[in-house]
């Protein structure tokens, strides 16, 4: 799932900047998400990226199961390099923005990470976490672009199409992994019950 809302959501590209916490609305989102996730029959582990906004989102989810939030750097936001902290209204005017939207597989952020490297990192992290909890139910709190990239990979969709996926703050995306191909159970879920969530 994606972290909750912050004071800069939709305004700047925060990337991996430290010290960005959930807003009051973000904390409320996290509590509602924790209530929804509590509907699941089991949760074996809760992971988050090292950033404050993901850890704060994960805390109520873990607390409901008396679990500790485990940190995995593979769940980090894309490294936006020199673009970190810049206003989105400024970035959207750059010619590179069109590449990011339509051919992200060809783009590397100046001084930062490529979208391909980000996708490889998040997929590797999820594989590693799954190996630690075979057959388990695990909640991973991450960031919009890594989640979208992971969904694209699970669907077998080219990375250049991943911007067609929407991942809202505190939305839940569920993927079932078994012996065959991954099965995407839900994407960007913000309100429906999770109680019956399972592969058909």
Locate each region found by the language model.
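Extended, charge-rich low-complexity interaction segments
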Residues: 99-111, 195-200
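Acidic, low-complexity terminal tails and accessory targeting/binding regions
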Residues: 42, 78-89, 131-136, 153-200
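Loop-to-helix element that buttresses phosphate recognition and phosphoryl-transfer chemistry
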Residues: 2-61, 108-123
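Active-site signature of alpha/beta-hydrolase-fold catalytic machinery across serine-
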Residues: 60, 149-153
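Short active-site segment of divalent metal-dependent hydrolases/proteases
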Residues: 6, 146-147
């Amino acid at each position: 799932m994606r972290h909750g809302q912050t004071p800069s959501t939709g305004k700047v590209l925060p990337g991996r900047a430290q010290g960005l916490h959930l807003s009051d609305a973000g904390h409320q989102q996290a509590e509602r998400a924790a209530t929804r996730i509590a509907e699941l029959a089991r949760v074996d582990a809760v992971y988050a990226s090292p950033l404050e906004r993901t850890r704060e989102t994960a805390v109520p989810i873990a607390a409901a199961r008396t679990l500790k939030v485990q940190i995995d750097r593979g769940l980090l936001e894309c490294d936006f390099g020199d673009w970190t902290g810049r206003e989105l209204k400024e970035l959207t005017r750059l010619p590179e923005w069109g590449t990011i939207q339509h051919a992200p597989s060809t783009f590397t952020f100046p001084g930062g990470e490529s979208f391909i490297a980000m996708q490889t990192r998040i997929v590797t992290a999820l594989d590693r976490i799954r190996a630690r909890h075979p057959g388990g139910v695990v909640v991973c709190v991450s960031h919009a672009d890594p989640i979208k990239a992971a969904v694209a990979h699970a669907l077998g969709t080219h990375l250049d199409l991943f911007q067609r996926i929407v991942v809202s703050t505190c939305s839940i995306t569920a993927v079932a992994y078994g012996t065959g191909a991954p099965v995407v159970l839900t994407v960007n879920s913000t309100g429906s019950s999770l109680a019956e969530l399972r592969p058909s």
